[in-house]
Amino acid sequence: MTPTVTSTSIDDDRPLLELLATAPDAERFAFVTDGEGAVGWGVAARIAVGTGPDRFARARDGLRAFSGSDEVVAFASFTFDEDEDGSVLVVPRTMLLRRDGETRRITVGGTDDGGGGEADEGADAAPLPDRTPLDRPRYAGSTVRDDVWLDTVAGAVDAIDTGSLEKVVLARDLHLWSRTPFDVDRLLLDLAGRFPACHTFRVDG
């Protein structure tokens, strides 16, 4: 069954992430660079990609139902290790796309609303919700000690310099705590404001 897709132009030049913050209470997604890109909320389709070497093929097959529209955007987050769980591929029920200064609202029919209902309310007309003061976050360290982390980074740099390694992805966790809940919407707005040329994205994988 081919989902129904509707597209309308909206007259609102506020930042996409600010518009997302006014959206109905539902699962939210974002990928924004230099003020343009896509945000979405609600779930029209959640595609199970699983693990293993065929997960990207399963993702491609799952998106074929939406191939009739060039405005539908899927938000994805794939694990680096193909054997690890946690990869996500979602088509939001409602999306706002901004290209070359024009903003369009895309609504996709589906069966799983992800708590977002039809999600066709006017986020383009709603004000930003009031924000309660935030507590300063405290850093509580990582499960990887600083000296071990620095040695790992230095080893990777040496391997690249000697030509035994061309590319490496290093990551470690960082624990934070706060007396007030973390406000993801505000965090995204701050990140995009401070680093507009970087990709600011939100996918809960």
Task: Please identify what each model-predicted range represents.
Residues 1-205:
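Signature of the chorismate-utilizing enzyme
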